[in-house]
From Swiss-Prot:
HAMAP family: GTP_cyclohydrol_B. It catalyses: GTP + H2O = 7,8-dihydroneopterin 3'-triphosphate + formate + H(+). Belongs to the GTP cyclohydrolase IV family. InterPro entries: GTP_cyclohydrolase_FolE2, GTP_cyclohydrolase_FolE2/MptA. It comes from Cupriavidus necator (strain ATCC 17699 / DSM 428 / KCTC 22496 / NCIMB 10442 / H16 / Stanier 337). The lineage of its organism: Bacteria, Pseudomonadati, Pseudomonadota, Betaproteobacteria, Burkholderiales. This is GTP cyclohydrolase FolE2.
Amino acid sequence: MNDINPAFVMPDVQSSPDTRQIPIQRVGVKGVRYPVTLKTPAGIMPSVGTFNLDVHLPADQKGTHMSRFVALLEEERAPLELSSFRLMLDKMLEKLEAEAGRIEVTFPYFISKTAPVSGVESLLDYEVTLTGEVRDGAARVFLKALVPVTSLCPCSKKISQYGAHNQRSHITMNVELAGELPVEALVRMAEEEASCELWGLLKRPDEKFVTERAYENPKFVEDLVRDIAMRLNADDRIVAYVLEAENFESIHNHSAYAVIERDKRVD
């Protein structure tokens, strides 16, 4: 028999008091994969998000209600954009009866690109992360993008009679936002400052262009972060950032790496 006596009330263990009086800064669920739709300049894009959701737990409360995090994802099926993401964060705090919390979602984001010479179109994928958090009554939203590019070594070009070593590089930008910033705009900041950008599909004339473009635009890893930092510094939609560049060196079994961090509110 599965009949439940309506007079029987199941105990809410999570809401019971805790005598240890130790607050928990972040408690929740991690690595929840859920379908999402993304609102992009090209229209609605289906994707799959990996969510981390957590809240602050007061010292006098035994536990949080873990099921409510997944219930939130089930309820929030509107296309994901910055405005709806902020609303999701507010709803999580209300549902979990919490004063502070955090949502992080990572998903593949596809941009249609046109090859530089042949004009053929193809998609290129980027790893994008949205993070929203409320602490001490203040809300903050972060946009992170990992952008693959090509880098070509200036030293190798200078000392060689012909050719220069080049490699794929990853530019990672994690920016705190003061206004709406499309993913495409952030991606272009990195691609336009690289030795050359990448495409999913290239024909032979395009490959010639890419090779020559990189050769004419050599950059050290230091050049990459400095040039991109100038773009981030000039954009009023960005109030703080962590900018990383990693070159997967083709002549070494290690990477070259550089980081620039800045908070415009304190300098």
